């Protein structure tokens, strides 16, 4: 997140304890920061954790014009907090139990066309070019791109691969173009080092990539492009799922667009002939 949301005093101690349990469970730093941001934003419109009711939470959600995925993220966050709050005996009920569940949106693949990616590469800096290639040619998430390190490059039987540390600290190995792998190895540490220490944040990567693409396209659409191209070449959805770091093939289906060549073939088959 660009700014750290200030936590109301009435919530601070309990939220800190809850976040500690997430860290203890192995959630990534990015996930913990995201949960903190969301709970801080919500509780600024609510009384204390003990006084908050389900109706009040529902009114907060009704007052915001959030996209479905954003709304779902906020609901999951406050539901997770109150589930912990109830299970640890801090309160005798869970006020989120009657908060309406968010309807799961019908997601569709959104692969960025290669022509836009090539245009972006043409005006990108060296660092931005590497960010774009890691998303479009290796299928990495923003947070994964931010954390790429020279130590992550390894030799496989056919060339170079990249060890990727994904959500929940799960690791996977993805093929990496030799020239890109050489650039990563040459950096001698984080490919995108932070200003003071560590590496840049996911939001930094996302902003740089989105700035170079036309409106409506983002770093995530490059990941969709990777999934679509890989499936078109292999016809192996399970393989694509593993390369993307998904725990479910069902999730991968959202990323894979039907190849245009097959759609055109279908159109040709039904076109009326004079």
Residue ranges and their predicted role:
Residues 133, 137, 225-247, 254:
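C-terminal catalytic core of tyrosine-transesterase DNA break-rejoin enzymes
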Residues 147-184:
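Conserved tyrosine-mediated DNA breakage-rejoining catalytic core shared by Y-recombinases
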Residues 91, 106, 112-142, 146, ...:
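Basic, Lys/Arg- and aromatic-enriched nucleic-acid-binding interface segment
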Residues 91, 103-119, 168-179, 191:
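DNA breakage-rejoining catalytic core of tyrosine-based enzymes
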Residues 1-7, 270-274:
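C-terminal secondary-structure termini that scaffold catalytic or DNA-interacting sites
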Residues 5, 168, 244, 249-269:
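Catalytic-site neighborhood detector that most strongly recognizes the C-terminal catalytic loop/helix
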Residues 177-216, 220:
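Active-site/catalytic core of tyrosine-dependent DNA strand-transfer enzymes
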């Amino acid at each position: 997140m660009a700014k750290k949301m200030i936590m109301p005093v009435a919530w601070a101690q309990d939220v800190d304890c809850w976040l500690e349990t997430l860290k203890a469970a192995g959630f990534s730093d990015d996930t913990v920061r995201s949960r903190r941001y969301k709970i801080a934003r919500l509780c600024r419109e609510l009384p204390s954790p003990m006084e908050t009711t389900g109706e009040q939470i529902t009114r907060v959600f009704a007052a915001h014009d959030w996209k479905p995925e954003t709304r779902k993220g906020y609901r999951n966050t406050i539901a997770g907090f109150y589930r912990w709050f109830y299970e640890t005996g801090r309160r005798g009920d869970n006020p989120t139990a009657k908060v309406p569940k968010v309807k799961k949106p019908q997601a569709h693949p959104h692969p960025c066309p290669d022509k836009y990616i090539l245009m972006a590469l043409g005006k990108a800096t060296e660092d931005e070019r590497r960010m774009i290639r890691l998303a479009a040619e290796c299928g990495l998430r923003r947070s994964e791109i931010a954390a790429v390190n020279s130590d992550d490059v390894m030799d496989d039987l056919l060339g170079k691969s990249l060890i990727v540390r994904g959500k929940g600290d799960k690791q996977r190995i993805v093929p990496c173009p030799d020239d890109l792998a050489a650039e990563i190895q040459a950096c001698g540490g984080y490919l995108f080092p932070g200003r003071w220490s560590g590496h840049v944040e996911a939001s930094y990567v996302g902003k740089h990539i989105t700035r170079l693409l036309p409106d409506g396209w983002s770093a995530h659409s490059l990941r969709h492009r990777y999934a679509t191209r890989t499936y078109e070449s292999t016809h192996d959805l399970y393989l694509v799922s593993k390369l993307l770091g998904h725990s479910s093939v069902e999730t991968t289906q959202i990323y894979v667009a039907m190849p245009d060549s097959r759609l055109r073939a279908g159109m040709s088959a039904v076109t009326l002939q004079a």
